[in-house]
Amino acid sequence: MGSLEVERKTVGWAARDPSGVLSPYEYTLRNTGPQDVYVEVMCCGICHTDVHQIKNDLGMSNYPMVPGHEVVGEVVEVGSEVTKFRAGDVVGVGCIVGSCGNCRPCNSDIEQYCNKKIWSYNDVYPDGKPTQGGFAGAMVVDQKFVVKIPDGMAPEQAAPLLCAGVTVYSPLNHFGLKQSGLRGGILGLGGVGHMGVKIAKAMGHHVTVISSSDKKRAEALDHLGADDYLVSSDAARMQEAADSLDYIIDTVPVFHPLEPYLSLLKIDGKLILMGVVNTPLQFVSPMVMLGRKSITGSFIGSMKELAEMLEFCKEKDLSSTIEIVKMDYINTAFERLEKNDVRYRFVVDVAGSKLYQ
């Protein structure tokens, strides 16, 4: 099919200001070019990053903004040069919809670190047209940033994997932490953390969930299958667990001290930061030096890793624990997410919702 020159309108739910309240918003999609895929959205997960963006917590939000970067939909049309997809395919779109294609990260298949990457929303294309996300009827996306959802995987289960799943999978893959028998810690048991437990267990790791309270102990051990549970304020138990973990995946999106968790790592252990925190984190250097420990970070994952992760989850029969809601519930869902009142990811049934009020 050739380039689709006609601009088409769609309806999304947009924030207009830092109040973060979403309401229906009609806008025009960019033209569908030869390399583009036109996708009708089926569902979209809600990520904590969406909260930061709609409320301008990072100081770089532009409005109107249609959030959503855990998007699953059906391909309706493809451009003349599209080779990866055809009409009827169920596909996913994650956090990024473009990159320069020429830099070292792009040439190394880690395009998520490209300095010119284009976010799925709250960004602009090279022609100046704003990007809008997946809480909408449709999207137009370059085929390079679209991934096939494996046959048999439910769309609503696949959606959170496009961010939460690959965010955990990527550092385990990159840092050589996929082999069976490792001992890992998951700090924070939210949308990303619960997938961390599931993926690490599927890789054959001994998994310890670390939390600030005891309230999620039964959930972590009985439902998610974690092997141990630590309350960070329990000094005796934290001391017993010192020098026991090969890595910790830190998913906490608010300020917290790092020293208690560095003490849990073995020599050469890694504390991998994933939560978006606006205030400086603190630690004393001997905590790192005396154990040759590393504090590092990881950001989502590449398109290659995204495809690998989806196949891994299909093979291991892994899925997100979700609550499905309609679009008219989205503001309540955001309020609940800010209170950590979700088990563990909201997914909006976009196709089954009335987008106009």
UniProtKB/Swiss-Prot annotation:
Q: What is this protein called?
A: Cinnamyl alcohol dehydrogenase 1
Would you kindly state one Gene Ontology biological process term found in this protein's UniProt entry? alkaloid metabolic process
Q: What does this protein do?
A: Involved in the production of citral, a mixture of geranial and neral with a strong lemony scent. Reversibly oxidizes geraniol to produce geranial at half the efficiency compared with its activity with cinnamyl alcohol. Does not use nerol and neral as substrates.
| UniProt xrefs under Gene3D superfamilies | Medium-chain alcohol dehydrogenases, catalytic domain (3.90.180.10), NAD(P)-binding Rossmann-like Domain (3.40.50.720)
Coiled coil stretches, renumbered: none
Q: What is its EC number?
A: 1.1.1.195
**Organism phylogeny:** Eukaryota, Viridiplantae, Streptophyta, Embryophyta, Tracheophyta
Q: Which organism is it from?
A: Ocimum basilicum (Sweet basil)
Binding of Zn(2+) 1 occurs at: 47, 69-70, 163
Q: Write out the similarity annotation.
A: Belongs to the zinc-containing alcohol dehydrogenase family.
